[in-house]
């Protein structure tokens, strides 16, 4: 059964396809010659040393950063791909007194025409998304008053409110304690399992990825190249040592 499932997705057009892509800033490339396909149902983790370009790749998948050279194709047909993007928590401005519900509601803004009210259906969707991440009872609480793990779950709910084809998460385990990190990993795994949500996450928490065993494939960003394979193989201690000259225990 697993082989049939794999063959079906191998034959399908990729949702995202990098074709000899160069990425960089101010016209200066930091990554070149990238080839990467993401199919519906994939669950990938982008890993590598600090500054290797993991977040740059994630932003380019979402269309936030366009390539300097090459082509990134988004969508397997005429219908555009919808993204749910979870940035690093440090990028969220904390001075505005927004509630949990109001932050999650931002995920619907891409579907709302300027000057039009948010529909009842979208508000109900946001309530469902907050329930999915276990925060329905906190929807009226100020966002800055939450713990780090709770804030991260709100940002995931906001991404889900975009009704995405692909969920993109940039360091979702960063800056939270071990218990909260386990909760976040279990949540991401459940969303992928229950909804078939294509998921790509950036993480430097290699030990957590290996121990939780929820990511299907890992893509190492190493010396400007991409190396992709099954999670069990790519997170094995000998592979980690080769890629980072470090042991994860």
Say what each PLM segment does.
Residues 213-230:
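H-loop (His-switch) and adjacent beta-strand-loop-beta switch element
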Residues 142-146, 150:
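Conserved ABC ATPase signature
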Residues 167-171:
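Catalytic Walker B motif of ABC-type/P-loop ATPase nucleotide-binding domains
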Residues 105, 120-138:
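Conserved ABC ATPase "signature" region
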Residues 62:
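Helix-to-loop junction immediately C-terminal to a conserved catalytic motif
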Residues 163:
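Conserved catalytic motifs of ABC-family nucleotide-binding domains
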């Amino acid at each position: 059964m697993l082989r049939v499932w794999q063959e079906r997705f191998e034959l399908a057009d990729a949702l995202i396809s990098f074709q000899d892509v160069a990425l960089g800033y101010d016209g200066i490339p930091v990554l070149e010659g990238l080839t990467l396909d993401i199919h519906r149902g994939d669950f990938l983790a982008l890993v590598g040393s600090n500054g290797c370009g993991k977040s740059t790749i994630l932003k380019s998948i979402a269309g936030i950063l366009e390539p300097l050279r090459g082509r990134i194709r988004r969508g397997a047909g005429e219908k555009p791909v919808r993204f749910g993007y979870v940035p690093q928590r440090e990028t969220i401005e904390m001075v505005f007194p927004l509630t949990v519900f109001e932050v999650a509601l931002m995920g619907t803004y891409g579907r709302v025409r300027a000057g039009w009210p948010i529909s009842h259906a979208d508000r109900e969707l946001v309530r469902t998304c907050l329930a999915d991440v276990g925060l329905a009872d906190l929807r009226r609480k100020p966002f800055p008053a939450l713990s780090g793990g709770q804030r991260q779950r709100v940002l995931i709910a906001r991404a889900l409110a975009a009704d995405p084809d692909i969920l993109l998460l940039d360091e979702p385990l960063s800056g939270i304690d071990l218990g909260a990190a386990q909760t976040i990993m279990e949540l991401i795994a459940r969303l992928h399992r229950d909804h078939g949500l294509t998921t790509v996450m950036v993480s430097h928490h290699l030990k957590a990825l290996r121990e939780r065993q929820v990511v299907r494939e890992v893509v190492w960003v190493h010396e400007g190249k991409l190396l992709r394979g099954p999670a069990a193989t790519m997170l094995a201690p000998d592979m980690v040592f080769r890629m980072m000259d470090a042991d994860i225990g």
